[in-house]
Amino acid sequence: MDIQYTEEQELLRSSVQRLLRDQYDFDARRKIVASEEGFSCKRWEAFAELGLLAAPFSEEVGGLGGGSLSTMIIMQEFGRHLVVEPFVETIVVAGSLIEQTGSEKQKRAFLPDIIAGKKIWALAWTEKASRFDLAKVTTTAHREGKDYVLTGEKSAVIAAPWADYLIVSARASGQRHDRGGVSLFVVDRRAANLHLQSFKTIDGRRAAEISLGGVRGQLLGKEGEGVAALEACRDHAIGALCAEAVGAMGELNSVTLEYSKTRKQFGTTIGSFQVLQHRMVDMFIAHQEALSLMQHLNLSLSADDAGLSRLASGAKSKIGYAGRFIADQAVQLHGGMGMTDELNVGHFFKRISSINIQFGDPAYHVLRYAQLDAAA
C-alpha cells in the first residue's frame, strides 16, 4: 500500500522530522531517560508549539482536524527517534476519550490545556488480574453528592508519574465481568487518598501502581458505557502504537544494513555473506508487510470502517510478531554490542517489546481476531 500524502500532511511529516533531528537525537534521548523526571517538558512544549498535540483533534474543539492519519505520521517519526513523551497516553487515549465521551463542559475544561501542552493525562484501566480484559474491573465507584468515590487498585499505569489527571475505569454496578457496570472517571492525580508507587519500565518510560482509597472523581461520559468507550479508544491507540512500531522497525533495518556494510569478519564485510543478505531481505519484507497493514488500519480508522476492531487486532498481532522478529535479528547481527546501552539497537528492541504488550499482546489479539471473525 502506498499512501499519497496531501501537501499539509507532507508539511507535518517534514516538520516533525526536522524537530526530532535537531532536538531529539539518541544522545539527547538518553539524557532525558536518565533524568529524574524521565521526560522533557521542553520537548513537550515544542511539540505543542509545532501543533503536534493539536493535530488529531477536530477543529470544533481547537484542534487541526488531522485525525488518525496525522497521528500515524507523527508516531512513525516518534518511533524512529524513540520519543518517550506520553503522546499516545495524553493525546490519542485520554484526549480522544474526552472529545468523544465528555460533556461540553468537560471538553471546554480539559481539552485546551491538553492541546496547549499544559496538562498531561494517563489512562488507569489495567488491574493485576485483568490481563487485557477491559470489562474485568474490581475497582468500585459509588455516588456521593455530585461526585463519585473510587476504591481499588490499578496496575502498570503508563505515564502516571507525569500526569496531572487520570482517567480511571471503575465499576459502579454489576458483577466483575459485567460490561454494562463499568464507567470512566476523571481523577486529579494529586487527590487525597490516592497513593502512587512509580517505577521505570524496560524501555525507559515511567509507570506506576495506583491505590485508590476513597478518591473523589467526576464521571466522564454516561454511567455504564465505559467499556464501549475504551474499546473504541483501544482501536485508535493500537493504530498509533503500530505506527510507532513500524517507524522503529524501519530505523532498525536501516542501522543494521549500514552496520553490515562496515563490520568486517573473516577478512570481509558481514554484508557480503549470502546467508546474512537473505536474513536482511526477510527483515525488509517483514517491515514492508507491517507498513502496509499499519497504513490500512489507520486509513480505516480515519473512515470509521466496519470491522474496525477485527482489523485492529489483526494488525496488532501481525505487526507485533514482525517487530519482534526484526528486533531479534538486528540484535543478533550486531553481536554483543546490540544490547549495550551505548547503541540504539537495544533500546529499539526494548521499545518494540513494550509496545507488544500495550493494549494486548500478539497472542491475545490472535484470539480476539478469531472471536470477532467468528461473530461477523
Task: Identify the role of each PLM range.
Residues 100-102, 142, 168-171, 186-188, ...:
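Short beta-strand-to-turn element immediately C-terminal to the catalytic PLP-Schiff-base lysine
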